[in-house]
C-alpha cells in the first residue's frame, strides 16, 4: 500500500524536499524546519520527507524520535528513494498510527540525497521522481524554489523572493542561473505556488509567463520561545555570556551579505557610538557571498572595538539575543519575508527596518522605518529607538499584536490549502485562507 492508498477520509499524503536545508539553518531553512514541525502535528497529513545522507536524526524528531524507515530496497536504484513497501511501512511506524480521532501519521524519512549541491540537483531531477512514483504521494512540495522538471505528481513550490531575477548582482552567478531557471519552471509546471508575502506575490505576477494558483502564506512565530518574558530568571544572561555579548547593544541578525545592507549599519553605528559610549553593535550571523565590503568598512570604523561578531547563533540562543537587545536593526534592501524582524517585535524589542520593503508591509507601525541607503537616516533611527517615549510604547504594543497574528500552525494550514488545491480537491476541504489568484 502506498501513501496515496491510506484509508483515512480527509488525509492527504504530501512529499516535502528538505534536501536544501543546511546543517545550520537560517531563512528558508528555518521556514522549512518550522513548517514541517507544524505539519507533523496535524492529523490530516501523511508526510514523506526527503533529506540528505546523514541528516536523518534531525527529521526523526518530527515523529517523536522515530520516523518511518526510508532506506534501501528497490529504491536504491533510484538514488535510494526507497520502495513502496518502505513508504507504507512508515505510515504507521514508530511515532504514530493512523490519523483518526486526532492521532497522526508518522513522517516517512528518506535520507539518500547526495551531500554536494551539484549532484543533489541532479538527484532531484532523476532520483526524486522515481522515489515519488514508488512512495505514492498525492502532492510534492519544493519549499526552496525547485522541483523536478518531470514531476510524476502535482507539485507545490515556494518562492521566497525574486532577487535572483531582479537583482542578480546580490548573488553568486551560479545561484542566479539555477534559481532563475527554477522560478521559471515553477511558473510553468507547478500546480500551485506558495509566496511568503504579498510583496513577493506581486513581483512574481509581474515577471511574465504562465503561472499556477498563488497562495500567500506568511511565516509564523514560535510564541513559546519568542516572547518578552525570559523562560526563567537569568536564562538570557547565560546565553549572552556564552556568545560573548554585553548589554546594551544594537543587534543585526542574519546572513552577512550585500542585500542586508550591513555596511550601512556599520557606518550608522559609528555615528551614534560617539554619543553613546556604552552601546555596542552585535552582528549575529555567518558571512555570505560578497561579505568583503563589510570587513573593509569594519576595519575603518572609529569604534570597531565595540562591534561583536558572534558568527552563527544556535537556535536556542536566538530568543535571548533578540529579547535583550536595545534595538534590532534589519536594514535589508529587499527580503521575501524578514523573519528576524517579526521575531524581534514578538520579543517586544524596538525594531529599525527599511521603508518600502516587505518588513514595512509586515510590521507597519511596529517599526521605525528608514529609506534604504541613507546612513544618516539610519543613524537617526537608531537614536530614536533608544528613546522611551509614548511613541515607543505604541510601537511595542503594535509589534506584539502583529506577532500574535502569526503562528506556524496558521502557516501549516495555509500550505494544506495549497496541497489540497494541487491534488485537485475542490470540495471545500481547504479553507482558502491566504489564497490569491494571479492578478487578484
Regions found by a protein language model. Give the residues of each.
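Carbohydrate transferase catalytic cores enriched for Leloir-type hexosyltransferases
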Residues: 1-75, 79-83, 90-440
Amino acid at each position: 500500500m502506498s501513501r496515496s492508498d491510506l484509508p483515512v477520509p480527509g488525509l492527504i499524503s504530501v512529499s516535502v524536499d528538505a534536501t536544501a536545508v543546511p546543517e545550520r539553518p537560517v531563512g528558508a531553512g528555518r521556514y522549512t524546519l518550522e513548517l514541517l514541525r507544524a505539519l507533523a502535528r496535524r492529523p490530516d497529513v501523511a508526510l514523506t520527507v526527503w533529506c540528505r545522507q546523514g541528516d536523518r536524526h534531525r527529521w526523526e524528531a518530527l515523529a517523536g524520535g522515530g520516523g518511518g524507515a526510508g532506506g534501501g530496497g528497490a529504491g536504491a536504484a533510484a538514488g535510494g528513494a526507497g520502495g513502496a513497501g518502505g513508504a507504507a511501512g512508515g505510515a504507521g511506524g514508530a511515532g504514530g498510527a493512523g490519523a483518526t480521532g486526532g492521532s497522526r501519521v508518522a513522517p516517512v524519512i528518506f535520507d539518500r540525497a547526495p551531500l554536494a549541491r551539484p549532484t543533489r540537483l541532479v538527484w532531484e531531477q532523476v532520483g526524486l521522481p522515481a522515489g515519488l512514483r514508488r512512495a505514492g504521494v498525492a502532492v510534492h512540495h519544493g519549499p526552496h524554489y525547485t522541483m523536478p522538471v518531470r514531476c510524476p505528481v502535482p507539485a507545490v513550490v515556494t518562492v521566497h523572493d525574486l532577487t535572483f531575477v531582479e537583482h542578480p548582482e546580490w548573488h553568486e552567478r551560479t545561484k542566479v542561473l539555477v534559481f532563475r531557471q527554477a522560478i521559471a519552471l515553477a511558473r510553468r509546471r507547478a500546480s500551485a505556488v506558495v509566496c511568503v508575502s504579498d510583496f513577493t506575490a506581486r513581483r512574481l505576477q509581474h515577471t511574465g509567463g504562465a503561472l499556477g494558483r498563488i497562495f500567500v502564506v506568511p511565516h509564523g512565530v514560535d510564541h513559546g520561545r519568542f516572547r518578552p518574558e525570559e523562560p526563567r530568571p537569568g536564562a538570557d544572561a547565560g546565553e549572552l555570556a556564552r556568545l560573548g555579548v554585553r548589554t546594551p547593544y544594537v543587534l543585526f541578525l542574519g546572513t552577512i551579505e550585500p542585500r542586508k545592507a550591513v555596511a550601512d549599519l556599520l557606518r550608522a553605528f559609528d555615528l551614534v557610538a560617539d554619543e553613546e559610549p556604552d552601546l555596542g553593535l552585535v552582528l549575529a550571523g555567518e558571512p555570505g557571498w560578497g561579505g568583503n565590503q563589510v570587513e573593509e568598512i569594519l576595519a575603518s570604523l572609529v569604534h570597531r572595538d565595540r562591534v561583536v561578531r558572534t558568527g552563527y547563533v544556535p537556535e536556542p540562543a536566538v530568543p535571548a539575543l533578540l529579547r535583550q537587545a536595545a534595538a534590532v536593526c534589519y536594514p535589508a534592501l529587499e527580503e521575501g519575508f524578514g523573519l528576524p524582524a517579526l521575531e524581534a517585535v514578538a520579543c517586544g524589542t524596538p525594531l529599525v527596518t527599511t521603508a518600502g520593503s516587505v518588513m514595512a508591509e509586515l510590521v507597519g507601525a511596529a517599526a521605525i522605518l528608514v529609506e534604504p541607503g541613507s546612513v544618516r537616516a539610519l543613524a537617526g533611527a537608531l537614536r530614536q529607538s533608544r528613546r522611551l517615549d509614548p511613541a515607543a510604547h505604541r510601537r511595542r504594543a503594535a509589534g506584539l499584536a502583529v506577532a500574535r497574528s502569526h503562528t506556524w500552525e496558521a502557516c501549516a494550514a495555509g500550505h494544506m490549502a495549497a496541497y489540497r488545491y494541487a491534488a485537485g480537491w475542490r470540495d471545500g476541504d481547504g479553507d482558502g485562507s491566504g489564497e490569491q489568484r494571479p492578478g487578484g
